[in-house]
């Protein structure tokens, strides 16, 4: 738990505690909303005292079992049991690997101010490997090191401790307690056969309901330490029984969907309902549902023939820009029983060759415009790959279809659990990861979204096809139009890149439904686009400031979609009705039908409501893993420890996907996004989430967008400093000094960046998300003047940002 050489003086303890701060837990999520990010939950302010208290009492059979457990563990003390429980509870709420508490032994003195204090540091990586009995014994040995105790006035009120644990033999008044926001008082009242645990807290900082929830967890954890001595600490349940039941109810998302239908079946049903309705608009090209279906059927026949000879679930590449041809190619591949791999024609040659080799493609569908470059990219290495020019194939098939038989879909025995497509997501090592997606999971998602977005009335919606072909929003936009008898309006690339022409294009074509990232939409003024009814955001968090900025440009319904390529088509949605301009939290909503989610600890244990953990996704839509990447699959796709007996009987919900997002369950049953785990920072033991700083910065008048990252200082990896980059509204002269001064008034000191650098544009990657690696390096020393804006290293303005997407 600690090294063999224990500190013996207050100075040594201070040095030891400060040395573990980078991996330390942070209890800020227990604070009231208005205090979060403004103070740290530490004993560093003499003016912060416990003003309220709540108690739990362990008595009767529970107390008897507790005392029996202590005797069975070689007579360890109640203090050691309480300390073990406290550290586990702090870890549950603080999301850290090390916790620091002050053990105040008040059993041998009448005055708490003269009580001896022992700092206790627990390393949970080691601690969770022990059995409960071993962990208590180890802490009991720690408490017996009398030469390591120090005086209260030498270590308390110096910001060293996450919480104080007072072991007392009598009732202790609040006025007697040391100054600290959180103090636990434990009293073993053997004469009355009970153990009393009091949680004393600063009433202005903590909600009573929050404290009550913590005490539920204390009771649960205390009982497990006493009642399960042979179990490992990692196996302890960190949520109370009542909370676990509530979490299970919130995951009751099971529902019916057309599980006997493939995606092409859903489109074919729309064709039968409305054969002559306009299906796809691209430039001057307007295709009805009947025409789209006939072309797709002809293409499917060709794919099955000697031209390519596709087999069931064979992968076929699509190397096309957004167009009506892409829609026909996708449907034709599905009708032939195959699956597609989207490849962007704008990709570098190496990226294209990687996808071809990784998937073993034997054929790639392209057009006349891109065919020459594609053949050049494939070269001799992939000379056996057939390049299919789709216009030529469609022309030949139309000419050959004299009896109309080629316009009828091929009769094949196709499965609903067949592969639908394989798409690539970016890899942290720079190597893309292929993710296979199946018909049934996408059918579940797209039919759920159709109902949620009220898209079921044919002929009433016009959906913009805005996203690049290689990203899932492209397919989402295509399907939500075509399975519901709506019109898909393909946005030409030259229009999509123009912040002036695009809004006019929306109005000209009567677009009602637009789906894009917030980074893109912030460039478009949609105020006078009367046709637009729905704005759907995907790929980025919608912050409070982002919502307000969108409301300046759009007054209709806004939906924030939460999605992962590796999991369901869309995992969750959060709706904002027309007129809603504010949001009080960072909720991403609730899971869609047949999707489950779990906020789990480092040991995959369910966490209490309000505690931060990592978000895992289960249920319908979780991919089986990454193509040809067994190492990453084992790391990110895990056996679901919370699959029910019903799940196992049906063969569902067997795996969970580790998202890498930090989150917490809200009392409403919604999940609040807390940032990426790989962007989480610990500075001097305080958890710093850049999104919180970014949100505060955009509250300042004139600041349009902000991103915050950590930069290494001269001292290397341990010497890290926050740097913010911000954009201003046109004409706003927001200086660095002004913005830093504003943040200093709104945030605790450690969360205020060393620098705030104004940029002309913030670089984005091909996904439309901020490209962190492309942000310019800066001198960490603050300049004396506000200075001008720094140019982005990769994009020179609005067009540059949009082109990347």
UniProtKB/Swiss-Prot annotation:
GO terms for biological process: amino acid activation for nonribosomal peptide biosynthetic process; antibiotic biosynthetic process; secondary metabolite biosynthetic process. Pathway: Antibiotic biosynthesis; penicillin G biosynthesis; penicillin G from L-alpha-aminoadipate and L-cysteine and L-valine: step 1/3. One of its GO terms (molecular function) is N-(5-amino-5-carboxypentanoyl)-L-cysteinyl-D-valine synthase activity. It catalyses: L-2-aminoadipate + L-valine + L-cysteine + 3 ATP + H2O = N-[(5S)-5-amino-5-carboxypentanoyl]-L-cysteinyl-D-valine + 3 AMP + 3 diphosphate + 3 H(+). Binds 3 phosphopantetheines covalently. Residues 783-805 are annotated as: Disordered. GO terms for cellular component: cytoplasm. Its EC number is 6.3.2.26. It is an enzyme of class 6 (ligase). Its cofactor is pantetheine 4'-phosphate. Pfam families: AMP-binding. Keywords: Antibiotic biosynthesis, ATP-binding, Ligase, Multifunctional enzyme, Nucleotide-binding, Phosphopantetheine, Repeat. Each of the constituent amino acids of ACV are activated as aminoacyl-adenylates with peptide bonds formed through the participation of amino acid thioester intermediates. Belongs to the ATP-dependent AMP-binding enzyme family. This is N-(5-amino-5-carboxypentanoyl)-L-cysteinyl-D-valine synthase. The lineage of its organism: Bacteria, Bacillati, Actinomycetota, Actinomycetes, Kitasatosporales. The gene is pcbAB.
């Amino acid at each position: 738990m600690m090294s063999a050489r224990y500190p013996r003086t207050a100075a040594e303890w201070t040095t030891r505690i400060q040395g573990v701060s980078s991996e330390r837990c942070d209890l800020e999520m227990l604070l009231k909303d208005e205090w979060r990010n403004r103070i740290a939950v530490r004993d560093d302010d003499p003016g912060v005292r416990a003003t309220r208290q709540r108690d739990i009492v362990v008595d009767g059979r529970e107390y008897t079992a507790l005392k029996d457990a202590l005797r069975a563990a070689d007579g360890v003390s109640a203090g050691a049991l309480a300390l073990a429980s406290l550290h586990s509870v702090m870890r549950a709420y603080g999301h850290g690997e090390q916790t620091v508490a002050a053990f105040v032994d008040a059993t041998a003195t009448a005055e708490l101010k003269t009580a001896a204090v022992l700092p206790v540091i627990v390393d949970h990586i080691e601690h969770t490997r022990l059995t409960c009995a071993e962990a208590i014994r180890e802490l009991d040995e720690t408490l017996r090191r009398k030469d390591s105790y120090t005086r209260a006035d030498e270590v308390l009120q110096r910001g060293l401790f996450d919480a104080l644990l007072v072991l007392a033999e009598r009732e202790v008044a609040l006025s007697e307690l040391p100054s600290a926001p959180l103090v636990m008082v434990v009293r073993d009242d053997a004469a009355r056969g009970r153990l009393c645990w009091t949680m004393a807290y600063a009433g202005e900082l903590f909600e009573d309901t929050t404290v009550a929830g913590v005490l539920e967890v204390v009771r649960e954890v205390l009982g497990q330490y006493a009642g399960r001595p042979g179990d490992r600490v990692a196996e302890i349940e960190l949520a109370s029984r009542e909370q676990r039941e509530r979490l299970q109810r919130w995951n009751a998302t099971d529902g019916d969907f057309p599980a006997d239908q493939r995606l092409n079946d859903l489109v074919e049903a729309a064709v039968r309902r409305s054969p002559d309705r306009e299906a796809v608009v691209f430039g001057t090209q307007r295709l009805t549902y009947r025409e789209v279906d006939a072309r797709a059927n002809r293409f499917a026949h060709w794919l099955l023939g000697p031209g390519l000879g596709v087999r069931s679930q064979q992968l076929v590449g699509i190397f096309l820009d957004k167009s009506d041809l892409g829609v026909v190619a996708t449907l034709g591949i599905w009708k032939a029983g195959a699956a597609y791999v989207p490849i962007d024609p704008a990709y570098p040659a190496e990226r294209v060759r990687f996808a071809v080799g990784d998937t073993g493609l034997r054929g790639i569908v392209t057009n006349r415009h891109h065919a020459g470059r594609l053949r050049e990219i494939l070269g001799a290495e992939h000379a056996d790959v057939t390049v299919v020019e789709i216009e030529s194939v469609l022309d030949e098939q139309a000419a050959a279809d004299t009896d109309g038989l080629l316009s009828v879909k091929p009769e094949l025995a196709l499965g609903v659990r067949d592969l639908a497509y394989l798409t690539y997501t970016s890899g942290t090592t720079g190597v893309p990861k292929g993710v296979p997606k199946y018909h049934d999971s996408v059918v579940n998602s797209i039919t759920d979204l159709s109902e949620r977005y009220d898209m079921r009335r044919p002929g009433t919606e016009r959906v913009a096809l805005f996203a690049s072909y290689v990203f899932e929003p492209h397919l989402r936009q295509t399907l939500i139009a075509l399975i519901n008898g709506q019109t898909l309006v393909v946005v030409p690339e030259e229009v999509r890149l123009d912040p002036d022409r695009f809004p006019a294009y929306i109005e000209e074509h009567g677009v009602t439904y637009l789906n894009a990232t917030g980074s893109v939409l912030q460039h478009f003024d949609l105020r006078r686009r009367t046709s637009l009814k729905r704005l759907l955001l995907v790929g980025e968090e919608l912050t409070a400031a982002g919502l307000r900025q969108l409301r300046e440009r759009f007054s209709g319904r806004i939906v924030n979609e939460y999605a992962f390529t590796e999991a369901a088509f869309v995992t969750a949605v959060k709706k904002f009705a027309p007129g809603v301009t504010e949001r009080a939290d960072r909720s991403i909503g609730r899971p869609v039908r047949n999707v489950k989610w779990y906020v789990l600890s480092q040991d995959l244990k369910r966490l209490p409501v309000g505690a931060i953990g990592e978000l895992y996704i289960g249920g319908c839509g979780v991919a089986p893993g990454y193509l040809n990447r067994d190492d990453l699959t084992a790391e990110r796709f895990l056996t679901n420890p919370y699959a029910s007996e019903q799940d196992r009987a049906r063969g569902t919900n067997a795996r969970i996907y580790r998202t890498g997002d930090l989150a917490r369950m809200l009392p409403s049953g919604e999940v609040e996004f807390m940032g990426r785990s790989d962007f989480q920072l610990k500075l001097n033991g305080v958890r710093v989430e850049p999104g919180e700083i970014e949100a505060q910065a955009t509250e300042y008048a004139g600041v349009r967008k902000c991103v915050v990252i950590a930069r290494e200082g001269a001292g290397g990896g341990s010497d890290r400093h926050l740097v913010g980059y911000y954009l201003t509204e046109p004409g706003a002269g927001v200086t660095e000094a002004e913005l830093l001064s504003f943040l200093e008034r709104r945030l605790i000191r450690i969360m205020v960046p060393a620098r705030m650098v104004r940029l002309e544009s913030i670089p984005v990657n091909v996904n439309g998300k901020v490209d962190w690696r492309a942000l310019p390096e800066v001198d960490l020393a603050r300049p004396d003047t506000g200075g001008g804006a720094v140019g982005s290293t990769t994009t020179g303005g609005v067009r540059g940002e949009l082109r990347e997407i």
